[in-house]
Amino acid sequence: MANDKKTVRKIIDAVKASGRTSLTAPEGKQVCDAYGIPVPKEGVASTAAAAAKLASGMGYPVVLKIVSPDILHKTEAGGVLVGVKSAAEVKAGFAKILANAKKYNRKAQILGVQVQQMVGGGQEVIIGA
């Protein structure tokens, strides 16, 4: 099993330096990668077209999630769409998620939309300290 503590320390130090107390989902994936913890395929897109390209590359269905250090509860903010099955749905979903996020928190810093391979089974894990 991988154990890259230096990478994890850099990630956590950068989060702390920015004044945050939680990781974004992509930062969490980097931590998982550093420790060899398998996670679904994913990427972050800043445009609807880029999101559709990511989704096509990993295969449908996918999950779309807002990426913002200011929105911790993505589902509550309308920032999650599951079972997205086509490029057209990805593009429409991208716009919907951004609109929902801005409505939920107008001042939120939006880093993009995470496109993630949809997998069945497993267990969602939230780690806190």
PLM regions with names:
Residues 1-129:
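ATP-dependent carboxylate/acyl-activation modules
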